[in-house]
Amino acid sequence: MASVALIGPEIEENLSLRYIASSLAAAGHATDIVPFNQAGDFPFALERVLALEPILVGISLAFQWRANDFLAFAVALRERGYRGHITLGGHFATFAASDIITDFPEVSSICRQEAEETVVSLTNALVAAEKTGKPAPLSDIAGLALRTDDGRPLLTPHPRLPDLAKLPRPDRRGDPAACFGHGISPLVSSRGCYANCSFCCIAAWHEQSLPGKRYRIREVDDVADEMVEMQQTRGIDIFVFHDDNFFVPGHKRNFERFSALADALEKRGIGRYATVVKARPTDVDPKVFDVLKRRLHCIRAYIGIETDADQGLETLRRWSPAKQNKKAIELARKLDLYTCFNILLFDPDTTLEDIETNIAFFRFAAEFPSNFGRVELYAGTPLLARMQQEGRTRGDYMQWDYDLGSPEMERVFSLSMTAFHERNFGNNALSNRIMGTRFDLEVARHFHPEVVRPDWIEEGKELSRILSNDGADGLEAVVRFVRRSAPESEEQTFVEGLAAGLRATEDRIRGRARALARSLRDAIGEGEPLTEIGDLVATPLQQARAVELSA
């Protein structure tokens, strides 16, 4: 039996690592899952891995923005004397495999695409090599990026994609997150994405491994079995579907699939439960969403609005008209379904008029929590390829940057991000806190309706309205400032004044949100809200758990 250490973010149960862990267990290998959620975890994670002395260290490199952290971890392992095999995996590692193999000799290999079978084969080969004392013939393993004797990258053929019906279910060690005593756990009912958005690496990743067939689904009976098992063995009542596409193309097919899943769950005698899903605006259909809420008990649906500007929809290749965004929000409002969304306010082609269009959308959907930011250039995406072809990128494969389409748009972006950074991206970002507050409310309303007052639900919506409209006011102020060609000498005073106003609004909302959380906790009388009552809060399923997740 070999020991394998798996390193990655465990802010919630990391399904990619946990599927690999269960596949390794099925092959007779032991694993330790070592959380590396933030910079402060680095020393603990490093000492933990060194103490384990594993034959293989697998590092999850799914998020490009954290690539430096995880590559530094590999370097630190070597500096501290670790001589075993270090492999990387994930979206970014797959796309940047040749560059990483070239630039980081500390990395032994990269597992490309879906890696369950690749990691098992790699571990088996390392174990065999340890027994015989001969080098492992790794070039025979599909799905690896290796290094030739002269240092050049060598990519073995693409791996065979695992059969979702035969994969061992993900390792569920450790305590789950909980909200008012109701366990929360992520799962997937499918893999892949049938869309082709220009800014997203997910579709490109699956297209690379399975051209033209990049979306696979599990049978509903298999999904229902997993849900019931988790409820019975771990106390899971809230199931968060992390599918890139929980919805399949076609409203009729979605209605049939969701109805079949509800039937399967009822047949198995599942207790009271709730679901959380993600949807595209084009997925939002009255009949489908009625089943989603009434029979699958959906308490939160993230809707991928992304932008309401026609130009943005074209640049991002969303292939849905802006009117569909409003229809989606109107239906969520009619069903009283908690919805949240993000807006990619800045993209390579954004104009001031596009900004104003999206500001109007924030006001239109003000009671639904939202956030905004810039489109980033991720490895493997069509948008990155386009920007490189146009000569508009700077940086390197670790982090590409670009300028917006005009100096005035660059100015709007710079001023906005300076003023809004704390609200949108800070450690205590209120835009995320509000999403968590609404999640707590919906959990309470669904599982404890007898104690939840209607005015608490309205208070949650009102806090979102205040924040959304305040943000819209702030963005409009930035646009006005830029439109009048205000001199640069006025920028600091303007941003400081705007930021001060934003912080004052945030303080008022934060106080009311804490009071609301206390009311919920006291009324329910068991467990805690998912968002902490204090300065450090978490978005749904983004609560860092300082739990050592070892076998």
Report each predicted region and the residues it spans:
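Structural recognition of alpha->loop->beta junctions
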Residues: 100-118, 289-300, 357-372
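Radical SAM [4Fe-4S] cluster-binding motif and immediate context
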Residues: 165-340, 360
